[in-house]
Amino acid sequence: MSTNRVAIVAVVAVLLAGAVFAVRSFADDAPMPQAGQAAPDFTLPSQDGSNISLDSFRGKWVVLYFYPKDMTTGCTIEAHNFQADIDKYQKLDAVVVGVSVDSTGSHKEFCAKEGLSFKLLSDQDKKVVAQYGSMADYMGVKIAKRNTFLIDPQGKIVQVWTGVKPSEHSKEVLAALNGYEKK
């Protein structure tokens, strides 16, 4: 075999391997559920060690927010803002639930350090993050994208926010929730 043919075969092999890797990288991230669809149910452990099912919140509004990492600047700002507004959410019969790929121990430390009273769920196997189309790859590490799903008391998604700004997001969600409550 000539040197040119060997080089061509090598290039094709590398391209095929890259294509297989790319397909595998994206295959674990399902399409994002949209407004009007039933929210996919799941059960995950929380910062206090209890297992929490999305279905256990039936009859209440749910603010299900995915975030990249405990104790980072943007995630701390977003969590502080949800906490600052927690009484407003409760008056609207809504619960705030955060999900990241961090451990329950990390969540427990984050809640204690930042004074968070709402549930943070640990999705270390990344199945729920993927199920909600919220997987991101950060320098080769799979983390959650900053996405939020507003779920009505019957378990239907009514609004989705993607790539949110942590400093403004809780106010956006409250405004939307107030609008749905008035309908």
PLM feature spans:
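Short active-site neighborhood of thiol/selenol oxidoreductases, capturing the structured segment around
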Residues: 55-76
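Thiol-/selenol-based redox modules, centered on thioredoxin-like
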Residues: 143-183
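Structural microenvironment flanking redox-active thiols in thiol-disulfide oxidoreductases
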Residues: 71, 76-116, 124-129
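Structural micro-motif
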Residues: 116-118, 135-138, 142-149
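N-proximal helix/coil linker or "cap" segments that precede and/or mark the start of modular domains
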Residues: 5-13, 18-41
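A short beta-strand-turn-helix
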Residues: 33, 42-62
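Short loop/turn microsegments at loop-to-beta-strand junctions
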Residues: 39-40, 61, 145-147
